[in-house]
């Protein structure tokens, strides 16, 4: 067994990089490289020396030179014939390899008959180089490829005589394969390189990877020479190559993947006796084995194709980095292209075997080495290219057919299997036709087109095609292609899902093909109207799932099964720049007639949308349309609406004309305002088709999903049953949308307002003379009578629904305006409702009066004067009845009121309110308890209107008559005085609140003061009255009026201090600022007095600086001052004296605490010494008492630290250093307590 050529860590490296070749010429190369026998190698493996190895290397280099010379000569010969492999066997040359033994003797190996191998592949070129390491200092080269040559030898022939002394060859042989030459390091000489033709890989895409070919070439050459020794041998040579491929970074755009894998090739190379029998078999085995290894790489690399790099078909066939391509390149490219027709990859073995069966003889002649893939003969090249074109045309037709499918029918028995779960897209046939016009590779250009289609929001549809069914597909397609008319619902579905309606621009493909409504509808819709992208992909996805084609209806192409259109449309006139938008509920049913496979009978099936969906949709539409409806109702009160077909853009077929009652969907032409188009996402009619059996349900079922309709949407409904040329248009605007939404509330049914507004219902008409000429097959299809009848009923109900809320919206507007104007009124009414004595008639009067006040903001001065005078007279009459007051006293009371009340109107109002509410509890202390100030202020703030005055005055008289039967009038005077005291601050608050008519009220007050000022006699009477009131307060003290008494005592001063209180109330910051400073000073003074510490350190410093005489006098004076002070005052000098007597300790732990303890302790000692502070050390490791003190008072501080006295902790090392930096260490130690 021959396994390697390495001797004592020295490696024999064979490196074949690429060399270019020109033309399609093939060269023959006879190689005779004798190899020693197994026995000789095993016997002499320990005797191989360095010189022997040098000779072996020289022989190899000579062999390489011969190869290069033959390679150059082969370029000049030009093209050879295909049977060249048989001719070159007669022109074999003998190569003699001399191996020197340890003694230095040279033996010549006998020549043998060689089996020639075709080195006819021009794509790859192998450069063989040898390298030997003789110095121990040099590191061996890494060996990525290990070659194990196993020879099963049945004969006993040796290589040559005297091979006992042949130096042995060790087992492991390193053969390094690369694309660039490697220089030799032996004796600083450049290595000799030779070029020989390589073999192409069976992988059609990997044309530059030469590792496997070069290795096999180098091994097979040696095996050929070994087999030439004895032609009668019956032996099989097994070459086992364990390859670890290096990272291969290709320059080609198609392959960018790095791979490193271990691959094993078992190659059976027979001798010349049985080469004719086994060559074909070995080639097939090698091709299939290598195909298995290289297929995963091919699949992954094909996906990395960039569109910009896709060039012509010839460019893709040529291997990158080489000069020219050949038949093998074209054949391999074809395999790659055929692979793109499948979804999960291409079975390489199966197709390879087909090629082998088809051209086994040509492969045997042209590809004897067994490494390259099967190469077809030139006469079969045109046939294969024609087959390629057939595959391309077949693919174009299939893609065209795929894009016209309505939906993905998983139960269809057609040859195409649509995989909608993955990333699918509909490839337009023109783009693929452009792809193959350039004859580019299938996977390269097709993938780029699919990527181009992704910008339209569609998903790629991967089509799985089996080659066995290609003929059946073509026949089936030709039979059904011209008949089936389908809508591109998949494109619409994906367009709605991706929030866009994209129009596909296409030209007519052929006479037998019809461009269906999906794409052309989109293009015409883009020309006629501006389209807003519809949001809500979830709803469209749900609808599309149920929108499969009813195949049983396809078998009966009756009028009922013909394409139907359900029209729900309201025509809106030209609004004045309102945000009026139109949605078109396109409900289309196009049923293919040629579908053969039918499902269950679903004829009467009807998909109903949920009521919440309809309610939300109705609300959203009503929001946009309520205001324009109300405006139109005001202008045109007849209550009828004009429904016209002005925007109709297509021509009705004969079937649609017969069914004149059919309904058509139109796209209104309003370029000024944006539009929202709701498109049907499938051809299945269950979700939106109207059934004749349930005409009552139609009004609820035919709706646009709420998720696809924006809130700014108004609908237009058309009906073709009646003709009313004088019908009016209903205008739906956006200003009353919110009002209508509030009025409608949670009403979701479409017929909620139908019965109430029957006189206002629409007369829905169809004007056939306005229909323009367009093909309905391309646009919207044909309509049936049943759908039109049912849609008319639903449209009438929907139109009635939109009319009714308008009347209520008008009413609601007036109510809202009243509410906005009476916002303050309602708040006041709510406050008044909380009062105990407020009844319903009174509340009604208050509301009426507030309305009057808001309407007439300016009140005449005369009316104000009359009201004030009437209030005063009524108040005087009440007192006259109760206490029999005389006329002079009435004059005094009147003068007093005029003087005290600055704001006459509000004062009179609040005075009587306060009098009522405070007098009643004042007279009934036994029942209700005490009348607190909080209750009085609350009631005073709530009663501020004029309407309450009359009611309160009447109640005053009644209450006083009932309650104060046995009491004196003085009690009433007390309550009057009480109310005066509380009245002024409350009136000021009311003045701030009431800003309307304030200027006029002030004028009225001034006029009243001028006219009603009393004489001096009246003023004296008022003062006398006040004195009497004070006496009466003392008499009534038993009535338990604590708060009332305290307020009444302060009453005489309220007149004088009223404005002062108001000024302080207006400017509280100024008054409080001074107080704050005073408070701060007072607090600091109190704090110092509590401490009773006097800082006399400065005085002591001065004493030391003065002379002795001066110091004595000052000390005496200071001592006198100190004697004058209290004895409990402590000075800082005393504190210092006491602290200086205490010892200072440095607490440390010399035995523990880490390596920082000693330097920190030394730092503390240095600081204390510099500040002239005596100290001593205390070791916590040995002093238990010090340890207890530190644990108790340190609070987690780290050692070392400074402690004064027994347990007065000054600080640890950090705090001491900070104090030292601030020059406060002595103060910290001695001046602190």
From Swiss-Prot:
UniProt feature, compositional bias: Polar residues: 201-211, 329-345, 409-422, 728-739
Keywords per UniProt: Phosphoprotein
The keyword Phosphoprotein belongs to this UniProt entry's keyword annotation: yes
Modified residues (Phosphothreonine): 861
Domain Glutaredoxin, chain residue ranges per copy: 1132-1233
Transmembrane intervals: none
Ranges of compositional bias, category Acidic residues: 466-478, 855-868
Note from the entry: Present with 704 molecules/cell in log phase SD medium.
Name of the protein in question: Uncharacterized protein YFR016C
Organism of provenance: Saccharomyces cerevisiae (strain ATCC 204508 / S288c) (Baker's yeast)
């Amino acid at each position: 067994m021959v396994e390697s050529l390495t001797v004592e860590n020295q490696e024999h490296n064979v490196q074949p990089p690429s060399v270019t070749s020109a033309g399609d010429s093939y060269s023959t190369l006879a190689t005779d490289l004798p190899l020693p026998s197994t026995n000789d190698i095993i016997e002499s493996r320990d005797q191989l020396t360095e010189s022997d190895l040098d000779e072996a290397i020289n022989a190899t280099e000579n062999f390489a030179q011969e190869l290069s010379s033959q390679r150059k000569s082969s370029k000049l010969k030009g093209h050879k014939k295909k049977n060249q492999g048989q001719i070159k066997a007669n022109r074999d040359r003998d190569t003699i390899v001399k191996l020197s033994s340890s003694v230095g003797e040279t033996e010549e190996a006998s020549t043998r008959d060689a089996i020639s191998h075709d080195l006819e592949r021009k794509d790859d070129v192998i450069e063989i180089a040898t390298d030997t390491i003789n110095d121990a200092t040099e590191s061996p080269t890494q060996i990525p490829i290990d070659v194990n040559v196993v020879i099963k030898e049945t004969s006993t022939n040796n290589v040559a005589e005297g091979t006992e002394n042949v130096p042995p060859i060790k087992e492991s042989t390193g053969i390094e394969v690369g694309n660039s030459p490697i220089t030799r390091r032996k004796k600083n000489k450049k290595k000799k390189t030779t070029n020989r033709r390589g073999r192409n890989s069976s992988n059609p895409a990997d044309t530059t990877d030469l590792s496997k070919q070069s290795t096999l070439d180098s091994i097979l050459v040696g095996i050929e020479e070994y087999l030439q020794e004895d032609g009668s041998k019956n032996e099989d040579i097994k070459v086992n190559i364990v390859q670890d491929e290096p990272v291969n970074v290709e320059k080609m755009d198609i392959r960018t993947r790095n791979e490193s894998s271990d691959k094993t090739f078992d190659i059976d190379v027979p001798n010349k006796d049985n080469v004719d029998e086994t060559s074909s078999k070995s080639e097939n085995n090698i091709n299939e084995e290598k195909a298995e290894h290289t297929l995963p790489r091919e699949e992954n690399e094909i996906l990395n194709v960039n569109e910009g790099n896709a060039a012509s078909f010839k460019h893709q066939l040529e291997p990158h980095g080489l000069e020219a391509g050949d038949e093998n390149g074209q054949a391999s490219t074809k395999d790659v292209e055929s692979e793109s027709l499948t979804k999960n990859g291409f079975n390489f073995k199966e197709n390879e075997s087909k090629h082998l069966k088809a051209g086994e003889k040509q492969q045997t002649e042209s590809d004897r080495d067994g490494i390259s893939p099967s190469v077809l003969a030139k006469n079969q090249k045109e046939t294969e290219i024609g087959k390629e074109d057939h595959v391309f045309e077949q693919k174009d037709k299939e893609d065209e057919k795929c894009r016209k499918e309505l939906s993905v029918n998983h139960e269809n028995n057609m040859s195409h299997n649509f995989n909608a779960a993955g990333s699918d897209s509909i490839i337009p046939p023109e783009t693929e036709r452009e792809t193959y016009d350039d004859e580019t590779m299938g996977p390269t250009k097709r993938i780029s087109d699919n990527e181009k289609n992704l910008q339209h929001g569609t998903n790629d549809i991967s089509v799985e095609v089996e080659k066995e069914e290609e003929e059946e597909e073509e026949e089936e397609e030709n039979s059904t292609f011209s008949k089936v008319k389908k809508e591109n619902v998949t494109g619409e579905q994906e367009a709605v899902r991706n929030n866009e309606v994209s129009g596909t621009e296409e030209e007519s493909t052929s006479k037998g093909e019809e461009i269906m409504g999906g794409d052309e509808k989109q293009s015409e819709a883009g020309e006629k109207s501006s389209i807003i992208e519809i949001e809500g992909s979830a709803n469209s996805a749900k609808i599309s799932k149920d929108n499969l084609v009813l195949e049983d209806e396809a078998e009966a192409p009756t009028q009922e099964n013909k394409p139907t259109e359900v029209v729900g449309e309201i025509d809106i006139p030209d609004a004045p720049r309102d945000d009026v938008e139109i949605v078109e509920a396109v409900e289309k049913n196009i049923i293919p007639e040629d579908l053969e496979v039918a499902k269950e009978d679903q004829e009467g099936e009807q998909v109903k949308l949920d009521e919440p969906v309809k309610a939300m949709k109705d609300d959203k539409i009503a929001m946009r349309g309520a205001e324009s409806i109300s405006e139109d109702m005001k202008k045109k009160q007849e209550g009828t609406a004009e429904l016209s077909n002005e925007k109709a853009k297509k021509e009705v077929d004969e079937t649609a004309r017969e069914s004149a009652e059919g309904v058509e969907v139109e796209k209104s032409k309003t370029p000024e305002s944006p539009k929202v188009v709701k498109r049907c996402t499938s051809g299945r009619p269950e979700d939106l088709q109207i059934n004749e059996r349930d005409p009552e349900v139609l009004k609820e079922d035919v709706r646009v999903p709420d998720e696809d309709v924006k809130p700014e949407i108004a609908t237009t409904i058309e009906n073709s049953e009646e003709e009313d040329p004088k019908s009016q248009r209903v205008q739906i605007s956006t200003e009353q949308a919110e009002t209508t939404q509030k009025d409608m509330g949670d009403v979701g049914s479409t017929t909620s307002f139908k019965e109430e507004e029957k006189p206002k219902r629409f007369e829905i008409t169809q004007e056939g003379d306005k229909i323009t000429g367009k093909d309905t097959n391309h646009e919207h299809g044909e309509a049936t009578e049943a759908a039109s009848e049912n849609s008319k009923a639903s449209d009438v109900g929907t139109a009635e629904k939109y009319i009714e809320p308008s009347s209520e919206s008008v009413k609601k507007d007036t109510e809202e305006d009243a509410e906005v104007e009476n916002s303050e009124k309602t708040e006041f009414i709510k406050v008044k409702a909380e009062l105990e004595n407020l009844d319903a008639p009174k509340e009604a009067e208050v509301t009426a009066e507030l309305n009057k006040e808001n309407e007439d903001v300016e009140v005449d001065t005369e009316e104000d004067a009359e009201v004030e005078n009437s209030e005063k007279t009524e108040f005087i009459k009440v007192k006259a009845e109760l206490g029999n007051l005389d006329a002079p006293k009435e004059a005094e009371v009147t003068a007093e009121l005029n003087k005290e009340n600055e704001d006459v109107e509000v004062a009179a109002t609040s005075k009587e309110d306060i009098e009522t509410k405070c007098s009643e509890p004042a007279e009934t202390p036994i029942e209700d308890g005490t009348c607190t100030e909080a209750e009085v202020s609350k009631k005073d703030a709530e009663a501020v209107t004029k309407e309450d005055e009359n009611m309160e005055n009447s109640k005053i008289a009644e209450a006083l008559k009932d309650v104060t039967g046995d009491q004196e009038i003085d009690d009433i005077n007390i309550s009057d005085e009480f109310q005066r005291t509380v009245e002024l601050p409350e009136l000021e608050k009311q003045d701030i609140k009431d800003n309307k008519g304030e200027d006029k009220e002030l004028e009225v007050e001034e006029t009243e003061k001028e006219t009603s000022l009393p004489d001096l006699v009246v003023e004296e009477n008022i003062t006398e009255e006040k004195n009497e009131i004070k006496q009466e307060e003392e008499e009534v003290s038993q009535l338990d009026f604590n708060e009332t008494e305290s307020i009444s005592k302060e009453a005489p001063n309220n007149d004088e201090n009223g404005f002062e209180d108001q000024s302080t109330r207006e400017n509280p910051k100024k008054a409080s600022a001074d107080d704050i400073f005073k408070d701060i000073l007072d607090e600091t003074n109190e704090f110092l007095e509590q401490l009773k510490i006097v800082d006399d350190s400065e005085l002591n410093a001065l004493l030391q600086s003065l002379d002795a005489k001066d110091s004595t006098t000052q000390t005496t004076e200071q001592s006198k001052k100190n004697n004058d002070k209290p004895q409990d005052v402590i000075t800082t000098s005393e504190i210092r004296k006491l602290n200086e007597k205490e010892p200072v300790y440095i607490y440390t732990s010399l035995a523990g605490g880490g390596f920082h303890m000693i330097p920190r302790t030394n730092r503390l000692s240095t600081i204390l010494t510099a500040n002239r502070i005596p100290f001593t050390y205390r070791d916590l490791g040995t002093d238990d008492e010090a340890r207890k003190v530190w644990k108790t008072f340190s609070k987690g501080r780290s050692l070392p630290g400074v402690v004064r006295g027994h347990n007065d902790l000054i600080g640890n090392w950090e705090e001491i250093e900070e104090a030292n930096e601030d020059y406060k260490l002595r103060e910290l130690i001695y001046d602190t307590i």
